[in-house]
């Protein structure tokens, strides 16, 4: 018994796929627990920085490969070990609502390792002694994904998200063979669209 996002049709396949996504999140939580247990068992838990993040949104109609929040907003968890002083800005249990781009992660890990961020690097450290002022905007783009060419650009601020679609008329049901096999809602949406639903 699940409630998919409102931009999906109310259909058994949609509910099944959404339940599968929620189950995968639970499974990921269990797997992270296994890794943490192994670090403790190996005696290195208090010496290991843990950074967990997603690289793209969910495999869904507005997720992976799209410039919408469901395709860009990804989880990130950072755990600092007991045997090292925490970097400036880090606090265990902190939920951070700053605008952070994944390009900032490389700059941040360099600073946390005591290294300099190269001047041409676009990322901004969000933790540590070299932490910069809060990023005002994060930018994203989409062009060709497999055989699907849909151009989008977006700007995400703390409060608003602007998405510009340069390919009107080409939407979520557009053919993409990779997603056809992995995401059963995609062919369903194309079928419903063809039927005028």
Regions found by a protein language model. Name each.
Residues 61, 148-150:
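Short beta-strand-initiation
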Residues 1-102, 106, 110-120, 163, ...:
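Active-site-proximal cap/lid insertion segments
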Residues 150-156:
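Short, surface-exposed beta-strand/loop micro-motifs that present aromatic residues
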Residues 74-75, 124, 137, 153:
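Extracytoplasmic/periplasmic beta-strand context in beta-sandwich domains
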Residues 62-65, 129-133:
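Substrate-binding cleft/loops of secretory-pathway carbohydrate-active enzymes
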């Amino acid at each position: 018994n699940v409630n998919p996002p409102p931009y999906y049709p109310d259909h058994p396949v949609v509910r099944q796929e959404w339940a599968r996504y929620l189950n995968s999140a639970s499974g990921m939580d269990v797997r992270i627990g296994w890794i943490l247990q192994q670090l403790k068992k190996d005696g290195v838990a208090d010496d290991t920085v843990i950074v967990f993040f997603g690289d793209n949104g969910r495999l869904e109609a507005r997720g992976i490969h799209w410039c919408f929040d469901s395709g860009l907003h990804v989880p990130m968890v950072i755990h600092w070990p007991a045997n090292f002083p925490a970097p400036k800005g880090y606090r265990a249990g902190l939920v951070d609502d700053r605008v952070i781009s994944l390009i900032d992660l490389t700059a941040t890990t360099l600073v946390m390792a005591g290294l300099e961020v190269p001047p041409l690097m676009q990322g901004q450290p969000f933790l540590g002694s070299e932490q910069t002022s809060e990023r005002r905007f994060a930018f994203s783009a989409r062009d060709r994904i497999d055989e699907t060419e849909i151009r989008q650009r977006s700007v995400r601020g703390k409060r608003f998200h602007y998405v510009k679609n340069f390919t009107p008329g080409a939407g979520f049901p557009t053919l993409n063979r990779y997603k056809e096999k992995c995401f059963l809602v995609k062919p369903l949406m194309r079928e419903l669209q063809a039927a005028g639903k």
